[in-house]
Amino acid sequence: KRLQAKRGFAEVDIQVSPNYRLTLLTTHLKSKLATPEADEEEMREQEALLLREKVDAIFKATPDANLIVLGDFNSTKDSRALRSIIGRGRTALVDTRPAEKNGDDAAPANPRWDPAAITWTHFYGKEDSYSRIDYILLSAGMAKEWRRDGTFIVRLPNWGVGSDHRPIVAEFAAEEGR
């Protein structure tokens, strides 16, 4: 059965200066709510493959593109959908993995996994669970300009009044001529 993506992708090219351009590619993949048409996880996987095709087309046209892929992926880090979007090899995207600024300043024992970092971005009331399903992914070029210390999950009082997601902030220092 062929299904249509309910939400598309938004692509925005930003000419920061005459010598610097970046592309934002945003998404909101299928929610976790069950649908009668198909399995929602499979639907997200198919949407993720379409998004990765778009990422690959950008890299084919501009191999050193300054690309940021972001949004509500409705998928955890180990899902096939997210792995498809991140990709492999030269065009693999970098996960910024933002965390709350909660005062912890000890270096993690393993830099790839920091158990003290609070990284959840979404509360799913039906399952009473907190998870990270919102992402900011970067091309290799953007990753070089990414400021880790300026990237975090915003912690606000009453955050859940307006949304079941928490905002993410990422900071970059653009290099001219890229």
Question: What are the residue ranges of the model-derived segments?
Answer:
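Metal-dependent phosphoester-hydrolase catalytic domains
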Residues: 4, 13, 56-68, 75-178
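Acidic/histidine-rich helix-loop elements
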Residues: 1-2, 33-43
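Active-site metal-binding loops of divalent metal-dependent hydrolases
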Residues: 29, 72-73
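Structured beta-strand-rich core segments of catalytic domains in phosphoester-bond hydrolases
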Residues: 1-29
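A short local loop/turn or secondary-structure capping micro-motif enriched for an aromatic residue
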Residues: 31-34, 178
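A long, amphipathic alpha-helix that forms part
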Residues: 41-63
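A surface/extracellular/periplasmic glyco- and lipid-processing/surface-interacting theme
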Residues: 15, 19, 44, 68
